[in-house]
């Protein structure tokens, strides 16, 4: 028996679906197997999944847990090939995969430039974008009378907001959209993943070079200006890497959040009625959606820097740990016996959908702002909005990370 077999003997196990065909079903199976589950990823790579809210919350705050992939034992032993399908999600160097002083250095400049004030300044532009997209929805009606809300609202809202935020010129945006679509896919061939990484990096590098010459009122220009005032803060490559992190997380999370919220409301008419009651329940809709149907179902990885015990199970030093946000979002031990229900009136909604601790998502306030504006205005403009297809037939995004559907056909009804 190998050391790995000895450490996992008798431990619950689950093979995760790289296609993400059933995030919530898989999340339920994780919870059924116990708080700590050994999981198999594509390429027969093994990791751990901690499927209980309180335990995952403790882990992300534990100083013995690292985000740095250099602490992944299998990676250091040469057991993870460069063409592993998920390598692009893991083997990167940025503020998400850094610890300690290095993490503080990488995050400091972003925290100074991507402020609450800058997010609030995006409110009028976000409102303008949403209004324009809502105006155009009837023109996108298909022959069967439906409109794909993912394609024509949920997708372009964060894409346009982030493009404006970064100062990305119009002529670069079509290529950006094509590249972003592939970032969270876990069903692509390794060579496609690698080529896409290069493409999106080169595009953002061009944006940084442009804003270095032509400053604007955008985050990229602000980062470059701050970097010039403090040269040791970030290298030019790190500025590009920072933009890539914010783009990857900011777009996909907000897109899926809007889609999941609309789908939840249209399949829970009592909750939709409550949301439209006039008491401004839209922020509560956003928070309950983040808990009940987290936009990111699973998120890699953390690594113990020593053997740790979690719920009576030893996770060896250097083993990767997955954060299963879909699973912990419906953890009855945290959210009560009705954790599986969608209830926007739920008190004290506490979720981990945006992470927690020093690595919590910097873009969470912007995602909340975009989603709240989009939802409030959508249902005010189209109060009779209804689903245009059986919700059980909507195909999932092919990703073990992103949790959403590839289309959201709706019938608009009368315009208010």
Where are these regions (language model features)?
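Cytochrome P450
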Residues: 1-416
């Amino acid at each position: 028996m190998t050391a790995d077999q000895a450490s996992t003997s008798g431990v619950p196990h689950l093979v995760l679906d790289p296609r993400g065909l059933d995030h919530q079903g898989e999340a339920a199976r994780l919870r059924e197997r116990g708080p700590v589950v050994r999981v198999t990823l594509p390429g027969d790579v093994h990791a751990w999944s901690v499927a209980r809210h309180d335990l995952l919350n403790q882990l992300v705050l534990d100083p013995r847990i690292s985000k740095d992939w250099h602490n992944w034992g299998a990676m250091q032993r040469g057991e993870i090939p460069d063409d592993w399908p998920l390598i692009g999600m893991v083997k990167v160097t940025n503020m998400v995969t850094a610890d300690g002083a290095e993490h503080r250095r990488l995050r400091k400049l972003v925290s100074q430039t991507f402020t609450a004030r800058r997010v609030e300044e995006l409110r009028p532009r976000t409102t303008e974008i949403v209004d324009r997209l809502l105006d155009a929805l009837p023109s996108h009606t298909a022959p069967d009378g439906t409109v794909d809300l993912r394609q024509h609202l949920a997708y372009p809202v964060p894409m346009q907001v982030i493009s404006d935020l970064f100062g990305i010129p119009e002529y670069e945006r079509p290529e950006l959209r094509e590249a972003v679509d592939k970032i969270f896919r876990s069903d692509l061939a390794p060579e496609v993943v690698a080529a896409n990484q290069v493409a999106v990096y080169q595009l953002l590098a061009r944006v940084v070079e442009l804003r270095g010459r032509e400053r604007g009122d955008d985050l990229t220009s602000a980062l470059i200006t701050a970097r010039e005032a403090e040269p040791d803060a970030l290298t030019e490559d790190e500025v590009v890497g920072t933009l890539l992190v914010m783009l990857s997380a900011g777009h996909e999370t907000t897109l899926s959040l809007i889609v999941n919220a609309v789908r939840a409301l249209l399949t829970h008419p009592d909750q939709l009625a409550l949301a439209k009651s006039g008491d401004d329940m839209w922020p509560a809709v956003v928070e309950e959606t983040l808990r009940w149907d987290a936009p990111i179902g699973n998120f890699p990885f953390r690594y113990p820097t020593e053997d740790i015990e979690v719920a009576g199970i030893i996770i060896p030093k250097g083993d990767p740990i997955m954060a299963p946000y879909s699973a912990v979002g419906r953890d009855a031990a945290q959210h009560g016996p009705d954790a599986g229900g969608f209830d926007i009136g739920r008190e004290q909604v506490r979720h981990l959908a945006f992470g927690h601790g020093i690595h919590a998502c910097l873009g969470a306030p912007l995602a909340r702002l975009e989603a709240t504006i989009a939802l409030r205005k959508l249902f005010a403009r189209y109060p009779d909005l209804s689903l245009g297809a059986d919700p059980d037939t909507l195909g999932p995004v092919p990703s073990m990370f992103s949790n959403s559907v590839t289309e959201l056909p709706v019938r608009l009804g009368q315009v208010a």
